[in-house]
């Protein structure tokens, strides 16, 4: 059998194939088979996307869980002669003069490990270890070749490792063990988002990709919101129970994922497993069963003649000029969006508004973006959507700074929400755009680097936000300028609207050359 990447899977169909005359006469590539069989979006496709997307729900819970487990607990005085809760410094009082509210010191990591008088660096060390683990894991896991395990197994292993480590956190006896386990959790889940996005995008047709990729993003936000409810119900319990309540369901989820989730048909095709790929398409689209049966009857079954496709990994981005240029530009844009997405909520304290209200509204404002993003993707091209969005977000950030200086707090806060809203829209747009720019063989690695740029941008946020302590709200101007300035690099990227996904680097190069020559999609 010839190279399965470029060779048409079926050159013609016989008269009894049940396919129309036009289809019988044209060469039928695997990409055409995927587009034809997944042209409709049924319940089973929605189920498969939601099943994989649930990994992001549990991922979100582990990202934000330290907001509750590592919180500084409230306390009250026992000896009012020497203790005044409104004026006393807890670290200057004898331990017998005060007590934690609820009478239990195990409600928080701070109280259980006696960190109430420790430095802010030590108290924040577990959270920092989590993000350091995410950065280290992102770079390390990006070195794994795309064809090593498969999309489904990568989602499964990352979620399972995160869940098991989260359960083991309850056995921590000191802050050092706890910090180490938080590092492992961050390392394990560092690429869960990337793995899930790639698996989902490769199991839908071009028509439905913009809407389908918004489902896991919505589940991510719901995971953050559900954590608040779980934490509220467990507020009188030890912080260890919160880890159990979020990680045990994730373990059961992994079992369902293993039993019911389907592998990416495009990845199976890249491995020469065409018959298995057709079986997956048949399960996902029962209405196209007759069409797919006609295809599978023509498949070559002798696997010994299959020529192994070349192995691709992150190094291919450096050996191909076009790939390196694209991934570099994508990372520049995502760095700017990452600074804004993670930094704007962090700097909200510089505006004279209720911090709890501002954080709640920042979370809620994300939900409409998952409805608006598909509309933008379907009606406008990718580059102009990203460009206009980042320019609007940048202008909103600068206006937030100016209005805050002028004392117009309420209007400034509205523009703060607008900046965060545009950052989230830009993130959603770039996620779909990036998937379409790279072939199946390196798509997972590209998504990892996309995610890493976002995380590195987020890691710079605390430093930028701290500037607001000296010049109030100036951080919003910096976030806005970064978003709009770096967002203009999108003009370098090729337009991908309406184009199907390629599988190999060679196929991507041929299509790009054809598009550049003919100027048509």
Swiss-Prot record:
- Function comment: High affinity carnitine transporter involved in the active cellular uptake of carnitine. Also transports organic cations.
Q: Which residues are glycosylated?
A: 79
Instruction: Give the family this protein belongs to, as stated in its UniProt record.
Output: Belongs to the major facilitator (TC 2.A.1) superfamily. Organic cation transporter (TC 2.A.1.19) family.
Query: According to the lineage, what is the superkingdom?
Result: Eukaryota
SUPFAM superfamilies, A to Z: MFS general substrate transporter
Taxonomy of the source species: Eukaryota, Viridiplantae, Streptophyta, Embryophyta, Tracheophyta
> What is the name listed in the Swiss-Prot or TrEMBL entry for this protein?
Organic cation/carnitine transporter 6
For binding ATP, which residues are annotated in this chain's numbering?
A: 200-207
List where the protein spans the membrane. 38-58, 124-144, 155-177, 183-200, 214-234, 242-262, 327-347, 357-377, 386-406, 413-433, 448-468, 474-494
User: Which organism was this protein described from?
Assistant: Arabidopsis thaliana
Q: Which residues lie on this side of the membrane: Extracellular?
A: 59-123, 178-182, 235-241, 348-356, 407-412, 469-473
Q: Does the keyword Nucleotide-binding apply?
A: yes
